[in-house]
């Protein structure tokens, strides 16, 4: 497998996507996919607190739980680069923290919840799933403000800085950041 170094983190050029684990794939199938990826030199996997897709309150967090169970069983945490994401403002996800936001309290809680499900004490790449600003979601054109004021980017970044300083995350990112 080709390995690329990004900001000091060595990652395989192929990333194992996990968004169907817990909805379209069972835990056993997820573990088979992780075994296969590891056997073929893939060391990078992407997940999110809202997974699996299609997102529902009943299945939320299952993907991270499946990963955590596999890591606990196999003891291979150090061999993997794990990326996960916090869910920002979206009325469809009101079952997360009574309406997820990218404010300090929600980011810190989301990270702690992901760490618990992943059964690890750090996340290699912690991303905001969508920015807390107008953006297209799932191909939506335009943007409708849903009432709540958006969290200032500075507050989001300071919360991420706190997580980094505490050793809970190594790097930060933004998923779906296209305006």
Segments predicted by a language model, with ranges:
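Glycine/proline-rich, positively charged
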Residues: 94-179
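Active-site beta-loop-alpha junctions enriched in small/polar residues
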Residues: 19-21, 50, 85-89, 128-131, ...
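A short acidic, helix-capping loop that chelates divalent metal ions and anchors anionic groups
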Residues: 51-55, 90-94, 134-136
